[in-house]
């Protein structure tokens, strides 16, 4: 039942998300002011990684069979007809791009926090923060490469998967998930960390930004108040989205791993819920970033083409 529903869902989801990501990509590249170059670069990279992630997950259509030992990864998508090592590598690529996307959201929140304080940091400080945020990505990629080399490249392992997948019908087995090696623990720790760190950091940042805005409330025009309100609303949505879509299913994931129980909803839908932010993030960005919202308003005939008051304390990224 799940397989039939998701075989219809994935193509529809891809058809909805892909044009939206392309639209955001064009808006970010063409309509980002010069004072938003750092934010522009972050959003540009996030569009790329989210697009790669959604395309790969729709082609793979994964199911992690958690009650088996070791846990098997089943592929129901078009890539099930390829050799297992190809799908297994692309599985890790989709995982890495999802983690990078979450980290880029954290970087965006950090930039907004620094801008809200109206403090101009040295470029070296931003570089240090970016490097620190990217360290888990390098560790993750290294651990994934090790897993591919040890679990898929060996001739006997490739032959085993050829035998298992010799008569592919609705799915193929592309790999295993074990928690018996240091790289496997690193992978799951980094993935979980990227999911569970975003909501508290986003909500904490929201509280700090509101504090800075309220401290200058008496000297703020109505237009700036409106722009800041939409900015904060966007930050709230950005922080709460993983709290709603990702955290519950990952808690279920931990439970089924620990108990070796079979929960079909978790097995089939964890990949679906990982995809949800790629659908909502473009709309949140277009809503919460004033120049993009202004441009869309002009296209819709709901905004005048006159000069826009820029909230330098928040948007000067």
UniProtKB/Swiss-Prot annotation:
It comes from the Eukaryota. The chain crosses the membrane at residues 8-28, 42-62, 89-109, 128-148, 185-205, 239-259, 270-290. The keyword Membrane applies. One of its GO terms (cellular component) is membrane. Keywords: Membrane, Transmembrane, Transmembrane helix. It is found in: Membrane. It is a multi-pass membrane protein. It holds the Pfam family 7TM_GPCR_Srd. Belongs to the nematode receptor-like protein srd family. PANTHER family: SERPENTINE RECEPTOR CLASS DELTA-45-RELATED, SERPENTINE RECEPTOR, CLASS D DELTA. This is Serpentine receptor class delta-47. It comes from Caenorhabditis elegans. The lineage of its organism: Eukaryota, Metazoa, Ecdysozoa, Nematoda, Chromadorea.
